[in-house]
Amino acid sequence: MNRKNVIRMVTAIAVVVLLGWSFFYFSDDTRGYKFVDTSVAMSQINGHNVKSAQIDDREQQLRLTLKKGNNDTDGSDKVITKYPTGYAVDLFNALSAKNTKVTTAVNEGSILGELLVYVLPLLLLVGLFVMFSRMQGGARMGFGFGKSRAKQLSKDMPKTTFADVAGVDEAVEELYEIKDFLQNPCRYQTLGAKIPKGVLLYGPPGTGKTLLARAVAGEAGVPFFTISGSDFVEMFVGVGASRVRDLFDQAKQNSPCIIFVDEIDAVGRQRGTGLGGGHDEREQTLNQLLVEMDGFGDRAGVILIAATNRPDILDPALLRPGRFDRQIPVSNPDLAGRRAVLRVHSKGKPIADDADLDGLAKRTVGMTGADLANVVNEAALLTARENGLVITGPALEEAVDRVIGGPRRKGRIISEQEKKITAYHEGGHTLAAWAMPDIEPIYKVTILARGRTGGHAVAVPEEDKGLRTRSEMIAQLVFAMGGRAAEELVFREPTTGAVSDIEKATKIARSMVTEFGMSSKLGAVRYGSEHGDPFLGRTMGTQADYSHEVARDIDDEVRKLIEAAHTEAWEILTEYRDVLDTLAGELLEKETLHRPELEGIFASVEKRPRLTMFDDFGGRIPSDKPPIKTPGELAIERGEPWPQPVPEPAFKAAIARASQAAEASHQAAQSDTDGPPGQGANGSHAGDRQRQHGPTQPDYGAPPGWHAPGWPPQQPPDYWYPPEQQPSQSPYWPQPAPSYPGQAPPPYPSYPPCPSYPPPGQSAPDAGKPPAQLDEGVSPSNPPAHG
């Protein structure tokens, strides 16, 4: 309901209430009378203080005009009171005995009042009936509830472009094609391509899905409607389906246009007969959305872009081609993506020379675009808090810590003993990780309390990794158990500070056994399956699909992994106890240590050999032959420069070569049209020249140069002939693709018909350019994606 409708409704209600109050106020003839108890009225009658009286028999009330007011009547000389049923005769006799003027009034009641008593409920019922009828009428639902809440972006709003999006180049390229189709449909229609009807953006929160949609809105140049999935469903039945219909009606009236539905999982969750039943309001909304996206109705020129964090719970009918033709993953940015994101968000901000954005990108593995934007913004806020003029490297470092662990707890006062335990605990983590061979180096260790932690050690990977080996996961276990081992080794008793470390180690060990099949005893088997209900939006837990004996074996294997890591951490700390004491002392003095300082402390620490107790392949003997070397490794061995990456996928190069061959053939055919006339146009020898021009007239087998009245037979002007192709010649690109002879493919709805491409006498943009000279990632069928 918009603001204008609310104002109208409130005004109408106020007018009706005011009119009703005015009617009853001005029709009341008891104004001016003071209401008193019946006993007070009787005392005035008995005291000969009544000048005149009026008995209202219908209302059972008595009006008295007194000779003089007194304390009982609060000084009023006009009073009114009620009397019991059947007491009117006694009142009349009492007043007559006092020689008081008595008037008896029997009110018949007003006709308007009678009508209001009977007609008002009837009008109320009729109004409710009309309102519910309009609610069932689709978009004209009562009070505007069925109207779509989609907002159409205006031209005055600040625009986001693809240049403002970084770190998700693949998604930008896919969406750029949508924008290019809307602005330049001819190139696609000539090939018979159809624009995708729907695009689904899915990925973790903060990766830039909504930002991509805003960029499309800023660059498309067509009407853009935006709505949230939660705006469809309300408390009234039928509201969601009505709003879906109204949204697509608006879109069709403004086609070509784009609709963006954010958080579509609020309305597009998988249907079922469990919770909610088949008549659930959300299911009705989803069914209407499915019909509008791809049903019997016409949906010309309407593109639906949706975003979600949970593609796994969406209904399969919503994800099929024809509804969401293109599903684009938007994942966390890699190293190059993080660099680009930091450059975008630091643009326009005064960054100091000592601020290393490239190093910051390396230290923020796993952060999303939103996290990186928050880091830069937090650094700017910290600089402004200290009245600084430029954002420095330490400010960015502090901002990273604030985003990861929360603000520093400055007001927390801890004892010297607890601070010492924290220093040894974090030192145990750091030393255990430094001595393990398959773990990322420790970048920073601190005992400053942040959020719910009393300190932390940060291990930063030097490069992005998509795979983890068993040795790396065991090293992570040793790293996690280093704090508990230090507590037991130095203070001879554990503390509660290792609760998060134990939880992390248990999770890693259990996933190694039950998910990744890294236990030789249990084999490469996945134990436990997730089960739940899609209505809840998440799984309801893990179902144990194995026996009690297997469960006991799983617990034994998990315990064995953690105990081995605990023992390894203990041995490392025992061997380098002096180094641990030195590290703890430095932490107590400086509170935070970085990698250069740690390298000086750990100069005597050597890498431990890998744990081999779990290298059991069940009787299978691994090969002694090493794997082959990559081209980069071979180039390093030979002292050669690093090999260049593959410039573009094979299909792009193939398309470019075929397009150039087709263009060359077309130019050769055009040059032959200006040559000297040869033999007849209808003989068998003339067919070769005609084929070079494309299909014109069929060859009827007449002798060369032979003519006769009515020969050759004439065909209708728009008669269609199948194209003929030379054995060694590719067809001219692009070729028409009619659905049947005599009819060319219709242009895309709401667009003007396309001119031929390339125009006669002109060459394609890349004609005559060998494949090696084509720009990397650019081909006639793949325009560059800006930003």
From Swiss-Prot:
Residues reported in the UniProt entry to bind ATP: 203-210
Region (Disordered): 616-787
Listed GO CC annotations: plasma membrane
Residue ranges, Extracellular side: 27-110
Cited InterPro entries: AAA+_ATPase, AAA_lid_3, ATPase_AAA_core, ATPase_AAA_CS, FtsH, P-loop_NTPase, Pept_M41_FtsH_extracell, Peptidase_M41
Active-site residue numbers: 426
Listed Low complexity bias regions: 650-671, 700-709, 721-732
Subcellular location: Cell membrane
Note accompanying the cofactor annotation: Binds 1 zinc ion per subunit.
Compositionally biased intervals (Pro residues): 710-720, 733-762
Required cofactor(s): Zn(2+)
GO molecular function: ATP binding; ATP hydrolysis activity; ATP-dependent peptidase activity; metalloendopeptidase activity; zinc ion binding
Annotated transmembrane regions: 6-26, 111-131
Top-tier EC class: hydrolase
Topology Cytoplasmic: residue spans: 1-5, 132-787
Pfam families tied to this protein: AAA, AAA_lid_3, FtsH_ext, Peptidase_M41
Sequence positions that bind Zn(2+): 425, 429, 501
Subunit structure: Homohexamer.
Task of the protein: Acts as a processive, ATP-dependent zinc metallopeptidase for both cytoplasmic and membrane proteins. Plays a role in the quality control of integral membrane proteins.
NCBIfam families hit by this protein: FtsH_fam (TIGR01241)
PANTHER family documented for this protein: ATP-DEPENDENT ZINC METALLOPROTEASE YME1L1, METALLOPROTEASE M41 FTSH
Family from the record: In the central section; belongs to the AAA ATPase family. In the C-terminal section; belongs to the peptidase M41 family.
Record protein name field: ATP-dependent zinc metalloprotease FtsH
Taxonomic placement: Bacteria, Bacillati, Actinomycetota, Actinomycetes, Mycobacteriales
